Design a protein with these regions (language model features):
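Core segments of cupin and vicinal oxygen chelate
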Residues: 2, 9-54
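Eukaryotic phosphotyrosine signaling hubs
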Residues: 5-7, 72-77
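Helix N-cap motif at beta-to-alpha junctions
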Residues: 14-16, 82-85
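Short amphipathic alpha-helices within nucleic acid-binding modules
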Residues: 21, 84-90
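Vicinal oxygen chelate
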Residues: 32-35, 47, 79, 88-129
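Exposed loop/turn and edge beta-strand positions of beta-sandwich/beta-sheet ligand-binding modules
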Residues: 42, 73, 109
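Arg/Lys-rich, alpha-helical DNA-contact motif
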Residues: 52-57, 69
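Acetyl-CoA-dependent GNAT
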Residues: 61-63, 127-128
Length: 129
């Protein structure tokens, strides 16, 4: 049996803010897919990914005005970036600041920090360089 990881879906409340956030992390917008049922626009799916990878992040916007709770089961998504400081500067332009200053888990290890996306999802950002 051959299997592969395809995507993760997160519900969002403001697609434009979410798009700016994930593009600041280096993701590219790939496509938009409206979901129409019984002639009504029910949801719009927005797909993002990194240029060198097939896996995607699907952001779903439900047009019925639903509100969401993050729940206790969600932990975080981890994203590796080439230059942590540059990524954080780009996010700061959107008013997004790290929960605390970047730190190393172990001496000589990668620098990392956590931020929240526009819907409150926790995102770990790990600097590769």
């Amino acid at each position: 049996m051959t299997a592969s990881y395809l995507h993760t879906m997160l519900r969002v409340t403001d697609p434009a803010k979410s798009r700016a956030f994930y593009e600041a992390l280096g993701m590219e917008f790939r496509r938009e897919s409206p979901i129409v049922r019984n002639g009504e626009l029910e949801a719009t799916l927005y797909f993002f990914g990194f240029p060198s990878q097939e896996e995607e992040l699907e952001l779903t916007f439900n047009h019925d005005g639903s509100t969401y709770e993050l729940g206790t089961g969600y932990g975080h998504i981890a994203i590796g970036v080439d230059v942590l400081d540059a990524t954080l500067a780009s996010l700061a332009e959107q008013g997004i600041e790290p929960e605390r200053a970047p730190y190393q888990v172990r001496e000589g290890g990668s620098w990392l920090c956590f931020v929240r996306d526009p819907d409150g999802y926790r995102i770990e950002i790990i600097g590769r360089g």
